[in-house]
Amino acid sequence: MDGQFEQKKKQKDETYDIEHLIACFSPMIRKKLSNTSYQEREDLEQELKIKMFEKADMLLCQDVPGFWEFILYMVDENS
């Protein structure tokens, strides 16, 4: 039961982190998009935010091995 709660909390924190990241980059995105035509700005801004969300989600959800797991993997690979 606690595992599900922790997983939901972690997922909620990751979503908040991604939303915060997008909010931080939004002014820069809007400034850069001022060089594009008015009709394309909203679409491009939305596409950029989608790409940022996808990449951040991929990076936050990766399972990175610990130091010793990595060492054991390298030893097994070289054997």
From Swiss-Prot:
Function, as annotated, reads: Together with RNA polymerase sigma factor SigO, positively regulates the expression of at least three operons, including oxdC-yvrL, sigO-rsoA and yvrJ. Required for the acid stress-dependent induction of the oxalate decarboxylase oxdC.
Q: Which NCBIfam families match?
A: PRK14082.1 (NF010682), sigO_reg_RsoA (NF041489)
Q: Which gene encodes it?
A: rsoA
Q: What is this protein called?
A: Sigma-O factor regulatory protein RsoA
Keywords, comma-separated and alphabetical = Activator, Transcription, Transcription regulation
Induction cue? Positively regulated by SigO.
Claim: Chloroplast is one of the keywords in the record: no
Taxonomic source organism: Bacillus subtilis (strain 168)
